[in-house]
Structures are given as C-alpha cells and as structure tokens.
Amino acid sequence: MIHAGNAITVQMLADGIAEFRFDLQGESVNKFNRATIEDFKAAIAAVKANNDIKGLVVTSGKSTFIVGADITEFGQNFAQGEKAIVDWLMPVHEIFNSFEDLDLPKVAAINGMALGGGFEMCLVCDYRVMSEAAQVGLPEIKLGIYPGFGGSVRLSRLIGIDNAVEWMAMATPKKPAAALKDGAVDAVVAADKLLDAATDLVKQAISGRLNWKAKRQEKLEAVKLNPLEQMMAFNTAKGAVLAKANPAQYPAPKLLLDSLQAGASLARDEALKAEAEGFAKAAVTPQAEALIGLFINDQVVKKASKQHEKGAHPVNQAAVLGAGIMGGGIAYQAASKGTPIIMKDIGNPQLALGMKEANNLLTKQVERKKMKPVQMGETLARIRPTLSYEEFKEVDIVIEAVTENPKVKEIVLAETEKNVRENTIIASNTSTISITRLAKALQRPENFVGMHFFNPVHMMPLVEVIRGEKTSEEAIATTVVLAQKMGKTPIVVNDCPGFLVNRVLFPYFGAFDLLVKDGADFQQIDNVMSKFGWPMGPAYLIDVVGIDTGVHGAEVMAEGFPDRMKPDYKGAIEAMYEAKRLGQKNDVGFYKYELDKKGKKAKTVDPTAYEVIAPFVTGEKREFDNQEIIDRMMLALCNETVRCLEDNIVATASEADMAMIMGIGFPPFRGGPCRYIDQTGVAEYVALCDKYAHLGKAYEAPQMLRDMAANNKKFYG
C-alpha cells in the first residue's frame, strides 16, 4: 500500500499503474470535506515519492464517484468574508494543480455521479472514462455560487466557452452521450468494463501511443480564441444566461461569466485566481446563503421522511375517489411511478374525464421523448376506471379527491370505509377542511389521514400529509412513503384550518385585499411582488387559483382564525366573486384572459376590473412606495409561518421554508419565510411588525419572534 488514508488509498495494480481510490470512511458517499482535501494532499505526496508509479487510475469505492464539496462546511467558510474565502480556495487550487502537474498520465474512471468538486477532480485528470450508468456535471449555480475548485477554468478550455457556460449555467447533470459529444469525457463504456478501459488508456499514455502531455497542456494555457472571437462568445453567452437569470435575484451566473471572461486570456494559475475572486463575491451574497440553506433544508426534509419508512405498510394497490382533473392527475402520478391505481367515480363521463387527463399528460411525455409509447401503454394499464367498489377489498390506500365540500366528503368517506379492509388507509385530498372533523364520519379514524396534493399534481412537488387528532403513526408513515414513491416531497403537518401552506397563503391574500382597499393599484402590487421574486403577483395568482376557490378558502380561514383572518370590510377579491369574475376559469378576474398563439391563456389589462373594485376602495388612490408594499405583503405571510411553528403545526423552520417554496412559489433565492426573517434581522423584523401593527392582528409580531429578538437568536445558526 503506497498510501492508506481516511479518504484515499493508493496501491499498485500492475505494469507501473497505481489505483488512486477515493473511499471516505464512515460516509455513504465521497465528498471533498476538509479531511478529504488534507488526505488528497498527503496521497499526492506519497505518489510523488514513489518512483515505481508510471500512471494512475482514479476510482471510487462508493456507488457514486464524488458528489462534490461538503456543503455543510460552506456556512462557516463563507461567513468569513471575501478575502478569507479566496485565502481558503487558493491552497485547494494548489493541491488540485499539484495532482494535475504530476509527471505521469492520470485517468478518471467515473463509475457514478461526479458532481461539483467531484467532476472538478475528474477535470484535473488527463483523460476521463465514464460508465454508462454515470452522470457528470457542475451544478453549483443552484447553490448561488459557481465551480470553485477550478472547474470553470478547466472546462472552458476543454469543451469551449459556449458549451462550458451551458453546462454550468443550466446546472443539469449530463448523461454519458451528452458528455462524450461535448468532449468533457473521452470514452463511455459498460460499468463492468470501466476499470479495464481506464487502465488501457493509462497503458497507451505510458507507451506514448497517446500524447497525454499535449492533452494536459490545453488546460494550462489561455482559451484558444482571439479577442474578437472571445468577445462574440461572451456576448452570446451573456444574452442567453441573463435572459434566464435576473442578476438582481440570482447574481451567480453573471459573476461566473465575469470571471470566465477575466480569466479566458490568462494561463491556468492566474485564471484560477480570477475564478476564486469571483467565487468569493458570489459566496457572500444573501442569495448564496439562502440557496445553500435550501439545499440543506431539502436534506432535513428527506431525512424526516425517511424516518417513516419502517412504520409504513406496503402499498401494492392504491385507489382514488373522484375522477376529475385532480383525480386524473393523482392516478397519472401513481401509475407513472409504478403503483397500480383504481379510479372510481359515479358516472362514465367523469371517468372519461379522469382518463383523458392521464392520457393527455402521458402523451406530452411521449411527445417530449421522456417516455416511449410502449411505456405509455403500460402506465395507462395501471389505471383501472370503475363505477363500483368491487375491487376495493384489495386496496391498501384510498385517496379521496371529491369536491371540496365537507358534507359530500363525509358521505363519500363513510361509504368507502364500509367497502375496504380494516387496515386500509383512507386519505383525503382536502386543501382546507379539518381532518379531525372529517374523521368523525368514520368508524376507524386512526386509519384516516390528510394527503393534500397541489394543482397541477404532475408539476407541484409538495404533498402535505396531515395528522388528525386520532391519526395513527402507521397511517402517517404509509402516506409519506406513498407520496415519496409518487415522486413527491411529503411534509407532515398537524391539523388546523388550511393546514400549513393555505393557512400561510390566506393572510398574504388578506394583505393584498387591504392594500387595494387602502388605495394601492393591484397592478403595481403585482409588479412589485414579481420583481421581489414571486412567480406572479397576488392578483394574478388569485385569478389562476380561482376567485371562487379563494373566497371559499377565506371563509374557512376566517372561521378558524377570526382575530386576524376575518376582515370587517368587503375586499376586492369578494367584489370580483360577486361580479362573477372568477379568474382564468371564466376568463375574467382582476385581468382578462385570451388565448395566445400557443393556445395558452394570456392576461391583459381590463378596465372593468377597476370599476368592480372602485366602491370598495376607501383610501385615496395613490402610488405606494414599493418597499411598503413588500413589507405589508411579506409581514402577513411570514408572521403566520411563525405562528404555525408556535402552534406546532409544522415541526421545523426547515420544513416550513421548504413547504412555502414548493407549495406557493416563495422566491427560492430568499430561502423561505424563516430565512427571510433571519436575513432581515429578527429585531429589525419585529420593529417592522410594530410599525404596521395598527393594520390588524396579522401584522403583530408573534411572541416567538419577540423572544428570539430579545435573546439575539435566529432560525438558522
């Protein structure tokens, strides 16, 4: 054994070839944490000291290659400021450079995921051989940063600026064929041939049949483009990237382009310094803090879900009650992920509608070449439409998705319970109705749970799993595991009106209503909140949700929380409802909707909307300060999120933030309501609440925040 460290071993194979093997002890994956980087340095020194080594094959002892840097170390590193980040990165560059500069050929044998720092490790090798099962990529942009271990410098020299920018800005892992086509890897082989293929490449390089030094030299020099070609390449790249990423919201892509441009005409070492300086600028942004926090929160949510696996009973057969758009979407989602599902309704027209929805979604998958026609047929065969309960004795879980009316749901649920086994789980896809209330219609309330899908089901990643007063842990666990199997992210919440997401959303709509009442133009509110980072403003959002749905939900919330969700005035949303302007569903709401060239509903300004709401505007019509609009909208939403934590509706700030991002489109680069409060400053946020407390209870700071401010505490760190 030439080197035996905690993360890396080096041992001779044959013919002067050594295996440089990453296998981080005590971890399920390889990652570049501090310990691995130190071991990397020691392993390189051991290779340099051994004159018998003529070439290296770089391998992994895990099912993945290397998944990247240790993201949990970022917070501490990035909190030190730009200079400290550069001072941290430059020694890492020296270590990677010393491996690249070894006077012997090096081939990476990529057996699985090689992402971020993992692929940057592959780039310091002279050749890269990839298994057919592997994927490679530099996805750091998703974290609000960009590759910092030399990836931007080496990849742009290897595959050209245009391709490198696309790889890094899109942040999507590449499959073998795409990686080979772009020139990022040199060969793709079957998994069982990987080590042999990599070893053979090393032998060819040692024998001189391959000029590995010339291959390496390309990465050590400036980009091979003259100044005019460089200017054209970067102008094209900037146009494409900045059209998709607003630098005010996502600064990392522009900082990446700036550092690439600064380093393009420089040799490796100077270009790496430019990369480090640009990386440091990105790393200290609030967006990087929020997006890295989001990644860590995602891990927290997945870990919480995984804990339910042992308590779940298997779901070999599911059923959905109600074959509308929602029922059809649920059936499609289950079937497309391999779970057979019965779809029941009371009439053939309804069943036809549900099957049509599933068929349409599958057809789109085939058209986009994400599914083969034969797979579409197999998926449709897993959905069995029926008018009876005959087959329900074989069902492990039933998802009720009938109309959002408590009396209708109670009748359907009670009828269903009589037609299933005693241990069958019954889940209600309700968005606002109390699970504890609905459970009163059942003989076995312990088997009853809420399973709230968001519309459209195939696109929205979140599922709220709602625990009623008598819901068993087995019912929760089984529902969580099914949601995961369906490709969704489940978050378990306790029962209350609106559960978590809608309970938080309705005060946001309430804040909008109050702003309009006080004289704000709803278009200004929409523009301000869109620029703030929401996918759409609140007026447009309520049109998309459906104004009738919004009014019904508001009534449920007002009954549950009369002190802060029951206004003493009629607002613009209710005015639209009374005028039979329901939003997109009947083409008039706050906006008017007409089909565009692609057949999608596009909004246009409708003067009639202003006439409808005019009698309900009591304040003087004026242009509000943009920050006042942001503060009033965000305080109402964030305060209710904190109250959900106070009331133990949701267990952690991590889960609350993830739910708001996945469920209602909270701007990801702001990290969620709790992260937003942290970044505002808890004491400063409480002061804002006090400033607007005269507007009503929704604006009063929750006691949790006052306590946190008094003790200088934050949600994160």
From Swiss-Prot:
One Gene Ontology term of the biological-process aspect is: fatty acid beta-oxidation
Q: Write out the ranges of the annotated region (Enoyl-CoA hydratase/isomerase).
A: 1-190
User: CDD domains from the entry?
Assistant: crotonase-like (cd06558)
Molecular function as annotated in GO: 3-hydroxybutyryl-CoA epimerase activity; delta(3)-delta(2)-enoyl-CoA isomerase activity; enoyl-CoA hydratase activity; long-chain-3-hydroxyacyl-CoA dehydrogenase activity; NAD+ binding
Under InterPro entries, the record lists: 3-OHacyl-CoA_DH_CS (IPR006180), 3-OHacyl-CoA_DH_NAD-bd (IPR006176), 3HC_DH_C (IPR006108), 6-PGluconate_DH-like_C_sf (IPR008927), ClpP/crotonase-like_dom_sf (IPR029045), Enoyl-CoA_hyd/isom_CS (IPR018376), Enoyl-CoA_hydra/iso (IPR001753), FA_oxidation_alpha_subunit (IPR050136)
Region annotation 3-hydroxyacyl-CoA dehydrogenase: residue ranges? 313-717
**Pathway entry:** Lipid metabolism; fatty acid beta-oxidation
User: Which residues are noted in the entry as substrate-binding?
Assistant: D298, N502
Where does the record place the catalytic residues? H452
Query: GO cellular-component terms in the record?
Result: fatty acid beta-oxidation multienzyme complex
This enzyme's EC code(s)? 4.2.1.17, 5.1.2.3, 5.3.3.8, 1.1.1.35
UniProt keyword annotations, A-Z:
Fatty acid metabolism, Isomerase, Lipid degradation, Lipid metabolism, Lyase, Multifunctional enzyme, NAD, Oxidoreductase
Pfam families the record matches: 3HCDH, 3HCDH_N, ECH_1
Site features described as Important for catalytic activity, chain residue numbers: E120, E140
Q: Give yes or no: UniProt keyword Ligase.
A: no
Among Gene3D superfamilies, the record links this protein to:
1.10.1040.50, 2-enoyl-CoA Hydratase, Chain A, domain 1, NAD(P)-binding Rossmann-like Domain
Q: Where does NAD(+) bind?
A: M326, D345, V402, T403, E404, K409, S431, N455
Isomerase is among the record's keywords? yes
**Function, as annotated:** Involved in the aerobic and anaerobic degradation of long-chain fatty acids via beta-oxidation cycle. Catalyzes the formation of 3-oxoacyl-CoA from enoyl-CoA via L-3-hydroxyacyl-CoA. It can also use D-3-hydroxyacyl-CoA and cis-3-enoyl-CoA as substrate.
Against PANTHER family, the record matches this protein to:
TRIFUNCTIONAL ENZYME SUBUNIT ALPHA (PTHR43612), TRIFUNCTIONAL ENZYME SUBUNIT ALPHA, MITOCHONDRIAL (PTHR43612:SF3)
Q: Which NCBIfam families match?
A: FadB (TIGR02437), PRK11730.1 (NF008727)
Family stated for the protein in its record = In the N-terminal section; belongs to the enoyl-CoA hydratase/isomerase family.
Q: How does it assemble?
A: Heterotetramer of two alpha chains (FadB) and two beta chains (FadA).
Protein's recorded name? Fatty acid oxidation complex subunit alpha
Which organism is this protein's natural source? Acinetobacter baumannii (strain AYE)
Give the encoding gene's name.
fadB
